[in-house]
């Protein structure tokens, strides 16, 4: 991702949703300093998110700014079982839309993050993963 503001080491992340999905609002957010657009895939449809990504990229291009796309993957608070079954469609969406970052919440072990990385590698993607640590147990090595 290209630096959008010289000498800035902090990035402003804005969560976009129904109230902030118009080109006009996105233009205001970008002009106000938004560096990364966060889309929470827990809400809305993949088609709605696809359209929003197109709008963000179009407005960013008009303003000659580079804006990152962060896709926050949905997940249950009690994540167990097959990671591939939980994330496959959303990871494919992230890869096909060239997301700049993927966020994971409610991860219960380092192994789950490794599995997501393995799935991304299979898809020939190296999208950075941001993990939200909910419990101390999640930090334990697997």
Language-model segments: residues:
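Non-catalytic helical/linker scaffolds that mediate oligomerization, partner binding
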Residues: 1-142
């Amino acid at each position: 991702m290209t630096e959008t503001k010289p000498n800035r080491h902090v990035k402003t992340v804005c969560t976009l949703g129904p109230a902030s999905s118009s080109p006009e609002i996105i233009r205001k957010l970008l002009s106000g300093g938004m560096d990364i657009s966060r889309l929470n895939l827990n809400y809305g449809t993949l088609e709605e998110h696809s359209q929003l990504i197109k709008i963000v990229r179009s407005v960013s291009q008009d303003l000659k700014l580079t804006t990152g796309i962060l896709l926050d993957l949905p997940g249950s608070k009690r994540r167990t079982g097959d990671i591939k079954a939980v994330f496959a469609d959303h990871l494919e969406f992230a890869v096909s839309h060239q997301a700049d970052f993927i966020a994971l919440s409610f991860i219960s072990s380092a192994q789950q993050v490794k599995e997501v990385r393995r799935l991304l590698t299979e898809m020939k993607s190296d999208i950075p993963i941001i993990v939200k640590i909910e419990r101390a147990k999640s930090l334990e090595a697997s």
